[in-house]
Amino acid sequence: MKRTIAIVAGGDTSEFHVSLRSAQGIYSFIDKEKYTLYIVEMHGLDWHVQLPDGAKAPVDRNDFSFVLDGEKVTFDFAYITIHGTPGEDGRLQGYFDMLHIPYSCCGVLAASLTYDKFACNQYLKGFGVRIAESLLLRGGQSVTDEDVMEKIGLPCFIKPSLGGSSFGVTKVTAKEQIQPAITKAFAEAQEVVVEAFMDGTEITCGCYKTKDKSVVFPITAVSYTHLRAHETELH
Protein backbone atom coordinates (compact mmCIF):
# COMPACT_ATOMS: atom_id res chain seq x y z
CA MET A 1 0.00 0.00 0.00
CA LYS A 2 1.38 3.39 -1.00
CA ARG A 3 2.20 5.90 1.72
CA THR A 4 0.50 9.28 1.51
CA ILE A 5 2.86 12.24 1.68
CA ALA A 6 2.07 15.91 2.24
CA ILE A 7 4.45 18.35 0.55
CA VAL A 8 3.88 21.35 2.79
CA ALA A 9 4.38 24.75 1.14
CA GLY A 10 3.53 28.43 1.42
CA GLY A 11 4.04 30.11 4.77
CA ASP A 12 3.67 33.61 6.12
CA THR A 13 6.72 35.50 4.86
CA SER A 14 8.05 37.07 1.67
CA GLU A 15 9.40 33.63 0.77
CA PHE A 16 5.87 32.33 0.07
CA HIS A 17 6.29 32.01 -3.70
CA VAL A 18 9.82 30.61 -3.36
CA SER A 19 8.33 27.86 -1.20
CA LEU A 20 5.65 27.04 -3.77
CA ARG A 21 8.33 26.61 -6.43
CA SER A 22 10.27 24.31 -4.09
CA ALA A 23 7.15 22.21 -3.53
CA GLN A 24 6.54 21.84 -7.25
CA GLY A 25 10.14 20.70 -7.67
CA ILE A 26 9.86 18.09 -4.92
CA TYR A 27 6.52 16.92 -6.33
CA SER A 28 8.14 16.35 -9.74
CA PHE A 29 11.05 14.37 -8.27
CA ILE A 30 9.22 11.84 -6.05
CA ASP A 31 8.14 8.53 -7.60
CA LYS A 32 4.32 8.58 -7.96
CA GLU A 33 4.32 4.79 -8.35
CA LYS A 34 5.57 4.41 -4.78
CA TYR A 35 3.84 7.33 -3.03
CA THR A 36 0.58 9.25 -3.14
CA LEU A 37 1.51 12.93 -3.13
CA TYR A 38 -0.42 16.07 -2.28
CA ILE A 39 0.82 19.64 -2.03
CA VAL A 40 -0.58 21.27 1.10
CA GLU A 41 -0.54 25.06 0.82
CA MET A 42 -0.54 27.13 4.02
CA HIS A 43 -1.01 30.85 4.47
CA GLY A 44 -2.10 32.03 7.90
CA LEU A 45 -5.15 29.96 8.87
CA ASP A 46 -5.88 29.04 5.25
CA TRP A 47 -4.64 25.46 4.88
CA HIS A 48 -5.75 23.52 1.84
CA VAL A 49 -4.73 20.59 -0.35
CA GLN A 50 -4.16 21.14 -4.06
CA LEU A 51 -6.13 18.39 -5.81
CA PRO A 52 -5.13 16.96 -9.22
CA ASP A 53 -8.16 18.56 -10.93
CA GLY A 54 -7.14 22.01 -9.71
CA ALA A 55 -9.70 22.15 -6.91
CA LYS A 56 -8.79 22.82 -3.29
CA ALA A 57 -9.77 20.81 -0.22
CA PRO A 58 -9.60 22.41 3.25
CA VAL A 59 -7.31 20.80 5.81
CA ASP A 60 -8.70 19.83 9.21
CA ARG A 61 -5.99 21.18 11.53
CA ASN A 62 -7.19 18.94 14.38
CA ASP A 63 -5.54 15.92 12.78
CA PHE A 64 -3.99 17.25 9.52
CA SER A 65 -6.48 15.49 7.26
CA PHE A 66 -8.83 16.34 4.40
CA VAL A 67 -11.85 14.79 2.69
CA LEU A 68 -11.69 13.46 -0.87
CA ASP A 69 -14.75 11.90 -2.55
CA GLY A 70 -16.42 11.53 0.84
CA GLU A 71 -13.44 9.71 2.38
CA LYS A 72 -11.09 11.08 5.03
CA VAL A 73 -7.44 11.19 3.93
CA THR A 74 -4.60 11.30 6.47
CA PHE A 75 -0.88 11.66 5.89
CA ASP A 76 1.94 9.25 6.72
CA PHE A 77 4.69 11.84 6.29
CA ALA A 78 5.14 15.60 5.88
CA TYR A 79 7.82 16.95 3.55
CA ILE A 80 8.24 20.54 4.75
CA THR A 81 9.23 22.95 1.97
CA ILE A 82 8.06 26.16 3.65
CA HIS A 83 10.74 28.86 3.66
CA GLY A 84 10.39 30.97 6.80
CA THR A 85 7.63 30.73 9.38
CA PRO A 86 5.96 28.39 10.23
CA GLY A 87 8.14 25.81 8.47
CA GLU A 88 11.67 26.81 9.45
CA ASP A 89 11.16 28.19 12.96
CA GLY A 90 9.93 25.09 14.80
CA ARG A 91 6.21 25.81 14.76
CA LEU A 92 5.19 23.17 12.24
CA GLN A 93 7.67 20.74 13.75
CA GLY A 94 5.92 21.07 17.12
CA TYR A 95 2.52 20.66 15.48
CA PHE A 96 3.55 17.47 13.70
CA ASP A 97 5.24 16.15 16.85
CA MET A 98 1.94 16.46 18.72
CA LEU A 99 0.14 14.58 15.95
CA HIS A 100 2.90 11.93 15.74
CA ILE A 101 3.39 12.62 12.03
CA PRO A 102 7.04 12.20 10.94
CA TYR A 103 8.52 15.03 8.90
CA SER A 104 11.54 15.80 6.75
CA CYS A 105 13.62 18.31 8.69
CA CYS A 106 15.17 19.00 12.09
CA GLY A 107 13.19 19.20 15.33
CA VAL A 108 11.67 22.09 17.26
CA LEU A 109 14.76 23.23 19.17
CA ALA A 110 17.20 23.20 16.26
CA ALA A 111 14.70 24.89 13.94
CA SER A 112 13.69 27.65 16.33
CA LEU A 113 17.27 28.41 17.34
CA THR A 114 18.84 28.45 13.89
CA TYR A 115 15.99 30.50 12.42
CA ASP A 116 16.92 33.39 14.73
CA LYS A 117 20.29 34.61 13.44
CA PHE A 118 21.21 36.67 16.51
CA ALA A 119 20.13 34.03 19.05
CA CYS A 120 21.98 31.30 17.15
CA ASN A 121 25.19 33.34 17.07
CA GLN A 122 24.98 34.01 20.80
CA TYR A 123 24.44 30.30 21.43
CA LEU A 124 27.50 29.40 19.35
CA LYS A 125 29.52 32.14 21.02
CA GLY A 126 28.93 30.39 24.34
CA PHE A 127 30.85 27.38 22.97
CA GLY A 128 33.82 29.49 21.91
CA VAL A 129 32.87 29.85 18.26
CA ARG A 130 34.13 33.17 16.89
CA ILE A 131 31.32 35.27 15.42
CA ALA A 132 31.07 38.71 13.86
CA GLU A 133 30.38 41.71 16.09
CA SER A 134 26.71 42.67 15.96
CA LEU A 135 23.93 44.83 17.35
CA LEU A 136 20.32 43.70 17.87
CA LEU A 137 17.48 46.17 17.32
CA ARG A 138 14.00 45.23 18.54
CA GLY A 139 10.55 46.50 17.60
CA GLY A 140 11.51 49.58 15.64
CA GLN A 141 14.29 50.52 18.06
CA SER A 142 16.55 53.20 16.60
CA VAL A 143 20.31 53.47 16.48
CA THR A 144 22.41 56.38 15.29
CA ASP A 145 24.73 56.20 12.33
CA GLU A 146 27.56 57.12 14.68
CA ASP A 147 26.85 54.14 16.96
CA VAL A 148 26.91 51.77 14.00
CA MET A 149 30.15 53.27 12.72
CA GLU A 150 31.79 53.08 16.16
CA LYS A 151 30.58 49.66 17.34
CA ILE A 152 30.35 47.73 14.06
CA GLY A 153 32.13 49.70 11.35
CA LEU A 154 31.79 49.56 7.59
CA PRO A 155 31.15 47.62 5.52
CA CYS A 156 28.45 45.79 7.46
CA PHE A 157 25.29 43.81 6.84
CA ILE A 158 21.90 44.95 8.10
CA LYS A 159 19.28 42.23 7.98
CA PRO A 160 16.19 40.77 9.66
CA SER A 161 17.13 38.43 12.48
CA LEU A 162 14.42 36.09 11.20
CA GLY A 163 13.88 35.07 7.58
CA GLY A 164 15.87 34.04 4.55
CA SER A 165 16.42 34.28 0.77
CA SER A 166 18.10 37.68 1.28
CA PHE A 167 14.78 39.48 1.78
CA GLY A 168 15.43 42.69 3.71
CA VAL A 169 19.22 42.23 3.65
CA THR A 170 21.54 45.11 2.73
CA LYS A 171 25.31 45.26 2.47
CA VAL A 172 26.06 48.76 3.77
CA THR A 173 29.20 50.43 2.48
CA ALA A 174 28.43 54.09 3.23
CA LYS A 175 27.06 55.98 6.24
CA GLU A 176 24.03 57.32 4.38
CA GLN A 177 22.87 53.75 3.63
CA ILE A 178 22.47 52.78 7.30
CA GLN A 179 19.00 54.13 8.12
CA PRO A 180 17.34 53.05 4.83
CA ALA A 181 18.80 49.57 5.37
CA ILE A 182 17.35 49.41 8.90
CA THR A 183 13.93 50.48 7.63
CA LYS A 184 14.09 47.84 4.90
CA ALA A 185 14.99 45.10 7.40
CA PHE A 186 12.23 46.10 9.84
CA ALA A 187 9.73 45.70 7.00
CA GLU A 188 10.50 41.96 7.13
CA ALA A 189 10.79 41.27 10.87
CA GLN A 190 10.50 42.82 14.32
CA GLU A 191 14.16 42.19 15.13
CA VAL A 192 17.05 43.49 13.05
CA VAL A 193 20.74 42.61 13.21
CA VAL A 194 23.55 45.01 12.34
CA GLU A 195 26.53 42.73 11.75
CA ALA A 196 30.17 43.39 10.90
CA PHE A 197 31.39 42.27 7.49
CA MET A 198 33.68 39.23 7.50
CA ASP A 199 36.01 38.83 4.53
CA GLY A 200 36.96 35.25 3.72
CA THR A 201 35.93 31.98 2.13
CA GLU A 202 32.50 30.73 3.13
CA ILE A 203 32.13 26.96 3.42
CA THR A 204 29.16 24.77 4.14
CA CYS A 205 28.58 21.11 4.95
CA GLY A 206 25.20 19.50 4.47
CA CYS A 207 23.95 16.27 5.98
CA TYR A 208 20.81 14.21 6.29
CA LYS A 209 19.63 11.40 8.54
CA THR A 210 17.47 8.38 7.85
CA LYS A 211 16.21 5.85 10.37
CA ASP A 212 19.26 3.71 9.58
CA LYS A 213 22.17 6.11 9.15
CA SER A 214 23.50 9.65 8.93
CA VAL A 215 25.04 10.87 5.67
CA VAL A 216 27.46 13.81 5.59
CA PHE A 217 28.13 15.55 2.28
CA PRO A 218 31.58 16.85 1.30
CA ILE A 219 32.58 20.30 2.49
CA THR A 220 31.93 22.87 -0.23
CA ALA A 221 32.84 26.51 -0.75
CA VAL A 222 30.03 28.94 -1.50
CA SER A 223 30.27 30.52 -4.96
CA TYR A 224 29.37 34.19 -4.78
CA THR A 225 28.93 34.27 -8.55
CA HIS A 226 26.15 31.70 -8.21
CA LEU A 227 24.69 33.55 -5.22
CA ARG A 228 24.46 36.80 -7.15
CA ALA A 229 22.80 35.00 -10.04
CA HIS A 230 20.31 33.40 -7.61
CA GLU A 231 19.46 36.73 -5.99
CA THR A 232 18.97 38.38 -9.38
CA GLU A 233 16.57 35.62 -10.43
CA LEU A 234 14.77 35.66 -7.07
CA HIS A 235 14.20 39.40 -6.82
Sequence positions of predicted segments:
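Glycine-rich beta-alpha junction loops
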Residues: G44, Q141, L162-G164, M198-E202, ...
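Short, hinge-like loop/turn segments at secondary-structure boundaries
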Residues: G54-A57, Q122-L124, K151-I152, T210-D212
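Short, solvent-exposed loop/turn segments that connect beta-strands within catalytic domains
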Residues: E71, K211-V215
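Short hydrophobic/aromatic-enriched beta-strand-loop microsegments
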Residues: P102-C106, I131, V215-V216
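Single conserved hydrophobic/aromatic residue that forms the stacking wall/gate
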Residues: H226-A229, E233-H235
